[in-house]
């Protein structure tokens, strides 16, 4: 989940950049790992992507996860677009094409991140399977065209969708048809 920060201080040379980076460093005992795990939801009856609305849509999936986990909803223009763990130990968000993303808690070891991702997937399955939804953890959409890919109701994605075609030919595919793992 993006947590955008703006700093308009100009970089005036190599030392300014070095100092800026060094100011953000932490002692080794405070180093942490954070998982970003995206996956494509799809319907098992027809292998099509899952739209936002409807009784078996992304919104229903997020609402089910909210009830199960007790996490706080993230809203955009009244639409639930994610969940955040109340103490800041992780979040679930939506990417532009409905890619479901776990933004994990800051953890000490790769083994902890593995357990966190596995627990997330088990929780997700518990809500998704009754809806006829499964997930693909794969870098690119295997079969759905851009036109077949649903659009999530997140304000900034509308802005980005208008901008991307002006700066390249594959920006919309990157937004809607890719996942990170």
Model feature map: region roles:
Residues 1-169, 177:
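Terminal catalytic/cofactor-binding subdomain
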């Amino acid at each position: 989940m993006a947590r955008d920060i703006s700093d308009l201080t100009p970089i005036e040379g190599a030392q300014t950049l070095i100092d800026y980076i060094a100011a953000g460093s932490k002692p080794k005992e405070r180093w942490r790992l954070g998982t970003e795990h995206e996956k494509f939801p799809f319907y098992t009856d027809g292998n099509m992507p899952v739209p936002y609305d409807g009784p078996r849509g992304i919104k229903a999936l997020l609402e089910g996860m909210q009830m199960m986990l007790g996490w706080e909803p993230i809203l955009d223009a009244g639409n639930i677009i994610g969940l955040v763990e109340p103490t800041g130990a992780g979040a679930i968000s939506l990417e532009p094409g409905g890619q479901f993303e776990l933004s994990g808690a800051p953890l000490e070891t790769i083994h902890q991140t593995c357990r966190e991702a596995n627990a997330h997937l088990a929780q997700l399955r518990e809500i998704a399977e009754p809806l006829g939804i499964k997930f693909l953890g794969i870098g690119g959409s295997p079969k759905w065209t851009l036109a077949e890919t649903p659009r999530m109701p997140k304000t900034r994605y509308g802005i980005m969708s208008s901008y991307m075609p002006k700066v390249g030919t594959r920006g919309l595919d990157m937004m809607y048809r890719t996942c990170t793992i």
